[in-house]
Amino acid sequence: QGVGGLWGDLGEPEVFPSEAVTAGGTADEIHNVYGHNWAKLIAEGYKKDFSNQRPFILMRAGYSGSQRFGMMPWSGDVSRSWGGLQSQMEISLQMGMQGMSYMHSDLGGFAGDYFDNELYIRWMQYGVFNPIFRPHAHEDVAAEPVYKDIVTKAKAKKQVELRYQLMPY
């Protein structure tokens, strides 16, 4: 069926010393502009080849105005912890106020080998109300519900079902 979207992970220089200077300015000045320009480049290519489709581009970095390129940002490689989950609501609200309406997170958290069934379910419950519902994690702990114990899997299934019930809205 082809490609329905693109994932531009690491759309910013991950290791870029503050003292580095480029034609566009210092590293700190252009850090997020790099992701913005990458999203623009992808969107322009997407429109060239798929002119009748709205771009679907997952990007981790951007800048003011990046939403015009069909960019759907997530909060990055967030800690798989209660503190990691707690910060997601504020981040999503702030990004929404800045025009990034498709803001979301790696459901379940991304980084670390810590796993807590209760934390995972709470993150899935939060994700039901996000514009993008996407469990994703580093390889240390699988993010997909199918790899969880039977009780956690059943609870996650309820969240997925609720998500599908809400989709028409």
Map each language-model feature to its residues:
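Catalytic-domain carbohydrate-binding cleft regions of carbohydrate-active enzymes
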Residues: 1-169
